[in-house]
Amino acid sequence: MLRTIVTKIFGSRNDRILRRLNKQVRIINKLEAEFELLTDEELKSKTTEFRTRLKNGEKLENLIPEAFATVREASKRILGMRPFDVQLIGGMVLNNRCIAEMRTGEGKTLTATLPCYLNALTGKGVHVVTVNDYLARRDAETNRPLFEFLGMTVGINVPGLSPEEKRAAYAADITYATNSELGFDYLRDNLAHSAQDRFQKHLHYALVDEVDSILIDEARTPLIISGPAEDSSELYMAMDKLIPILIQQDKEDTEEYQGDGDFTLDLKNKQAHLTERGQEKIEQWLMEKGFINENESLYSPARISLLHHIYAALRAHKLFERDVDYIVKNGEIVIVDEHTGRTMAGRRWSDGLHQAIEAKEGVQIQGENQTVASITYQNYFRLYEKLAGMTGTADTEAFEFQQIYGLETIVIPTNKPMIRDDRTDIMFENEKYKFDAIIEDIKDCVARNQPVLVGTISIEKSELLSNALNKAGIKHNVLNAKFHAQEAEIIANAGYPSAVTIATNMAGRGTDIVLGGNWKAEVAKLDDPTEEQIEEIKAAWQIRHDTVKQAGGLHIIGTERHESRRIDNQLRGRSGRQGDPGSSRFYLSLDDALMRIYLTEGKLNFMRKMFTEKGEGMESKMLAKVIAQAQAKVEAHNFDGRKNLLEFDDVANDQRHAIYEQRNALLDNEDIADTIQVIRQDVFNHVIDEYVPPHSLEEQWDIPALETRLKQDFALDLPLSKWLEEDNTFNEDVLRERVLTVAISEYKRKEELVGQETMRNFEKGVMLQTLDELWKEHLSAMDHLRRGIHLRGYAQKDPKQEYKKESFQMFTDMLDTLKLSVITTLSRVQIRTQDEVEKAEQARQKIAERENAAMQYQNNEGTSSLHEKSEHKIGRNESCPCGSGKKYKHCHGSKAKY
């Protein structure tokens, strides 16, 4: 109450920031008349002038008025569009490391040109991030003429580019890219084996379009580069046959309640849990099928893999639905993004879930993969020096943006007042009554020439509604993951009078629905249109536009509330753009997922009693409050999940950062001999410590074991026992010094044989290969640790602290293993002289001749006997002619046929 009173008097923080930025807008507006008088060449030269001033020490912020005035004037001349004052404010907000909430149709694409140009002046690169490659290409091509006029280069980074094209994209002043491609390029750069194979420059400034979709909705989706793992497709098919015999029970067993089912479902977290009865039933089934022995437990360490497959199959059957969570296309399982309704080609669920769904649907089961490199969007975008974002719906997630990314959300006012009529939600007893009411609403709109956009939350629901509309004889278009290819055309026609469009989670996000239809799309269909044709199309559009405006603009129908208010607002935001009329209404039922999952049975029963007549709808303030509470619960739950993920991933992120930093230093450094020398000294001291404890008595030394270890691991045959007997001054320090001296001497001998350059390259190659292999194994071990760490809570231990402690120990162990493996490999490598190589080649040729003769013998005995007489056969125990010193049977003779 007090806070509201104070805000009314002094204004909110958002209001105060807008007032401050308006002062800058007035300065920019004063410059407009001056910049209009500049010639094109004078306007272009401003870029060089600004860059020179920056090099001379002027701050970037001081250039804002002139730089923005330059972009505004260039935009007027090149694009035929003048950025509004609110767009100038949006540009300044984006430059200030903030998120700009700009309503649909307010020109976010044009707004982005202002901070992009300003930050590109630094020469450090600007990345404009979009949710898909269509938007990346569209925005880049739209703004390219403007930036190139001002002397800036523009690049597009999307999947499928060649290395040269990708390198050129990153070299540009401003690069338009998809979020996933940027993340994967970062991972690929940190798997590169030469500095020239890396693409990304310094991560300076990222401007993220649809920032809520990328940094909130996809925050829990890790980007993973993986390699093949052990195949277990038969096991997935076997476990798939188990699921039909299992019975679900509504809630978990407690002291007061004992159900009769085999498993329970956690719909909020999409997890399944076995009951004791379920475990016993499964164990019996596994014994009958021969998967486990009698009296063997499902939870024994040797059978954990079986349990993993069972849970994957259970989740696949009971928690993931076809045409809701995924579709089957060309014999493959394709994930459907729950937030956008788009298919996510190439993406696969982890933890065996994807394979379990493939088994469920009877398609080919693709092999499991092992993680080679991974990062979340949360941690990737926090690598940028400067991060900003824009969207039409950010204010509801402002707290999370601030907490996780340190980004403040500023709501930008609309250029024209918004006049959309957002009507009260209507609740129905069940889905049938709800759909009946929706059909009636659509009929009314169609009769009045009003276009309708109907939003559904899944492909399944969109097809149910489509069938109902077909029965009612209403023409309509369906936009979901199955009809993704027709998206642009469907959206272009969605604003026509009486047009009815069904969209899954507003999959057409990023494209405006124009009242009366998109006349530019009509022109684009014509080959070389004349001015007369264009004018005819525009005139026809104007009539349709006026008709739709008179009918009330675009009408939005939501078929149920989403878990997040933000997704609902995105749907509503398709209507009422740039001061256009419009309306919206959500139709709900007690069968909706939000109601079933997040409202108690008591509340649902109470609400059912409020319906006195069949098919009646109910709207009230209490209903709005109940829905708001349910959505708040979900948002809080999802935020906790993302925050929890980040806290765990931050541990891995610190380790990832340390490894990648060292790896890049390796790539950039031509000579790592000094590093190898430091590691060698550390490794030998550590090995000697195992057999000769520091400051210990001679009786405690295990010299024979140390001799064996040095010979096996480092190819050093040293007479340590003899040194100890013959030298009275031989002590621990002398031992360490002599061993290291001999090791270095032997290594230098090898280096002299091959040359310094070859040895330096070999050292780097061994270091990189060993590091990559151990890091891959470490990621797998961390993943296993993370999956089971929550069980520590039962022992009254904090799982997060335990994870931090154990993962740190695993990391230090990995580094110790890295050092030992590198020095062991370098010490044991055998160097051959040119003479030895030539002898080996001669021996190889002789062996090949004998093998050919043996093959001829099988076809023609006579010629074979002549050959055998003319050539001496090398005995298996004779020295190999290659000069290696080994017996023939242990060298090239191992490949010969006898």
Curated annotation (Swiss-Prot):
Pfam family, one: SecA_PP_bind
Catalysed conversion reaction: ATP + H2O + cellular proteinSide 1 = ADP + phosphate + cellular proteinSide 2
Main location: membrane
Cellular component annotations (GO), alphabetically ordered: cell envelope Sec protein transport complex; cytosol; plasma membrane
SMART domains according to UniProt: SecA_DEAD (SM00957), SecA_PP_bind (SM00958)
Enzyme class: translocase
Cofactors that this protein relies on: Zn(2+)
Localization annotation: Cell inner membrane; Cytoplasm
One term of GO molecular function: ATP binding
SUBUNIT field: Monomer and homodimer. Part of the essential Sec protein translocation apparatus which comprises SecA, SecYEG and auxiliary proteins SecDF-YajC and YidC.
Function: Part of the Sec protein translocase complex. Interacts with the SecYEG preprotein conducting channel. Has a central role in coupling the hydrolysis of ATP to the transfer of proteins into and across the cell membrane, serving both as a receptor for the preprotein-SecB complex and as an ATP-driven molecular motor driving the stepwise translocation of polypeptide chains across the membrane.
Protein's name according to its UniProt entry: Protein translocase subunit SecA
Chain's gene name: secA
